């Protein structure tokens, strides 16, 4: 039997781009509205994705990074969440140590092997939330991922990181044309006079990769995280709930078209 797990890596070059918020909400929406079995993996040492679903690791409980370094059973650290159809591998308090190890000779294929061998039969979509940097943890995620979603905000320093992500992908042998699913823009203000300038800069680097749906600035996003739930469950009529649901459908449609294209190429 052929399984069709699709691994999405949410990434950014700097913090404050809405990366973790999108990882959480898109994952929950895929399960709730599209019936997908979703695994979230928190690779960010800040552990915000884990906290946002009430799944923070406490005490001496092992996390992803310790298990990978020790070559232990990764499935033992998958946790259920209160969201139907959504499981999570929480971040670990030893994330910083793993980040150091992973740049000094630790093989960068463990996560990919884990996804292929164990997760493929159990999940339809895996979403990996990466650190806002291009270190060892991000490299591990990029190698393991099928598609990348680059998270940006319409500000100069956020946009400047695009070229670095492109160079990073090339350095690990993953051309951006094949591996970037799209660019997601958050904290969007339709009234801003600089919108087109930022759009033009992004298009000059990643042509035709910007998602049609922009996530508008909305306080309900941070408020929903405090309640450890998705924004559409807590504030269903908010513009953030509408925007992220639309983005979820856009992502799903692209994944389906990419999967059909890949399958047809394999059968030629």
Swiss-Prot record:
Keywords: ATP-binding, Nucleotide-binding, Plasmid
Source organism superkingdom: Bacteria
Pfam families per UniProt: AAA_31
Residues the entry annotates as binding ATP: 13-20
Keyword Nucleotide-binding in annotation: yes
InterPro entries: AAA_dom, DNA_Partitioning_ATPase, P-loop_NTPase
GO molecular function, one term: ATP binding
Family in the record: Belongs to the ParA family.
This protein's name: Virulence plasmid ParA family protein pGP5-D
Organism: Chlamydia muridarum (strain MoPn / Nigg)
Species classification: Bacteria, Pseudomonadati, Chlamydiota, Chlamydiia, Chlamydiales
